[in-house]
UniProtKB/Swiss-Prot annotation:
Pfam families: Aminotran_1_2 (PF00155). GO terms for molecular function: histidinol-phosphate transaminase activity; pyridoxal phosphate binding. The gene is hisC. Homodimer. The keyword Ubl conjugation does not apply. It is an enzyme of class 2 (transferase). It comes from Xanthomonas euvesicatoria pv. vesicatoria (strain 85-10). This is Histidinol-phosphate aminotransferase. InterPro entries: Aminotransferase_I/II_large (IPR004839), HisP_aminotrans (IPR005861), PyrdxlP-dep_Trfase (IPR015424), PyrdxlP-dep_Trfase_major (IPR015421), PyrdxlP-dep_Trfase_small (IPR015422). The lineage of its organism: Bacteria, Pseudomonadati, Pseudomonadota, Gammaproteobacteria, Lysobacterales. Its cofactor is pyridoxal 5'-phosphate. Belongs to the class-II pyridoxal-phosphate-dependent aminotransferase family. Histidinol-phosphate aminotransferase subfamily.
Length: 363
């Protein structure tokens, strides 16, 4: 697909949209800045005056560090307020209200549907298949429904939240090939660091109808900093930047994120990822042996989806032990399930001990 044709997927009324030209987007140079109506003085709470001025809309140092981390060019990357902002930009930028659909694969992260609803974009569900080896995406069905429903965006969460399953790259490539010129395939890799499946970013050179979502909220432990990344065709990124709010990345958040991507910090992160993966295997095996546990799904994320004979009792037992997990019982097809994030060894042991006590009490 050519660069011009990928822009054909964008709403026609936005293709020439100039967006808001902020004071920080100009190329002017000087040492006295009086062009943005900022205060000339620092706030007493900000003695270093680090937050007196508006931030760079796309901090160059952070953008370069993220591009190096994810294996793309800086111009293929947009930094936003978590992946949520990137999802919202994609839906608003590509979907004509009431016409262009958004395809999702439930059970899955709810923000895709929320953003579609806010844009009045029809929502198309192609449920994950619940098989003996866990949930899986039905790529032929996804492609068929996307083509039949005029879907502009196809969200593939890999690893999927809350299902935990990942999609092989050859399957993602099948979807990309079948939907060229028809839809943008968005691979959400929020939990990619914990997965055995390589990132789909490596397919960008061959498929312009691919976008990848990444975040520093999970493996990099910066959830409160709200640093999300959209990786896609450079021309699409440039257009979406014009649709983005003027100053999406606060200076303190950008500074912390850049420090988190230094070599020493990344080494610590890699060790913690390895610990999570090890705990994932241990806790999976331990949960599967507990009476009252109906099924523990395989996971490529930092969490486990677990079905219980009595999910209410399990949920309450964990609360009584001071452990808060994600109740999935209101989610269609997960009426007996809880999602348990993997914590430290000690935290995971509290989960197992609380559930063990519950089962002993029942027995």
């Amino acid at each position: 697909m050519s660069a011009s044709s990928i822009l054909d997927l964008v709403r026609e009324d936005l293709r020439a949209f100039a967006g808001y030209s902020s004071a920080r987007t100009s190329a002017l140079q000087g040492d006295v800045w009086l062009n943005a109506n900022e205060s000339a003085w620092a706030n007493p709470a900000d003695p270093d005056a680090s937050t007196r001025r508006y931030p760079d809309p796309q901090p160059k140092g952070l953008r370069s560090a993220l591009a190096a981390l994810y294996g793309c060019a800086p111009e293929q990357l947009l930094i936003g307020r978590g992946s949520d902002e990137a999802i919202d930009l994609l839906v608003r930028g590509l979907c004509v209200p009431g016409r262009d659909a958004v395809l999702v694969t439930p059970p899955v992260f709810g923000m895709y549907a929320v953003c579609a609803r806010l844009q009045n974009a029809p929502l198309v569900d192609v449920p994950l298949v619940d098989g003996p080896d866990g949930f899986r995406a039905d790529i032929p069905a996804i492609v068929a429904r996307a083509l039949a429903s005029n879907a502009k965006l196809v969200f593939l969460c890999s690893p999927s939240n809350p299902a935990g399953s990942a999609i092989a790259l050859d399957q993602i490539e099948q979807a990309l090939q079948a939907l060229q010129g028809k839809a943008l395939v968005v691979v959400d890799e929020a939990y990619g660091e914990f997965s055995d499946v390589p990132s789909a970013v490596g397919l960008l050179g061959r498929y312009d109808n691919l976008a990848v979502l990444r975040t520093l909220s999970k493996a990099h432990a910066l959830a409160a900093a709200r640093i999300g990344t959209l990786i896609a065709n450079a021309e699409l990124i440039a257009l979406l930047r014009r649709c983005q709010a003027p100053y999406p990345v606060p200076t303190p958040c950008a500074a912390m994120a850049e420090q988190a991507l230094s070599a020493p910090a990344l080494e610590v992160t890699r060790r913690r990822i390895a610990e999570v993966r090890s705990e994932r295997e241990r806790v999976h095996e331990a949960l599967a042996q507990l009476a009252g546990v109906r099924q523990v799904y395989p996971s490529q994320g930092n969490f486990l989806l677990v079905r219980f004979d009595d999910a209410e009792a399990a949920f309450q037992a964990l609360l009584d032990a001071g452990v808060v997990v994600r109740d999935q019982r209101a989610v269609p097809r997960l009426a007996d399930a809880l999602r348990i994030t993997l914590g430290t060894h000690e935290q995971n042991q509290r989960v197992l001990s609380a559930l063990q006590r519950t089962q002993e009490a029942v027995a």
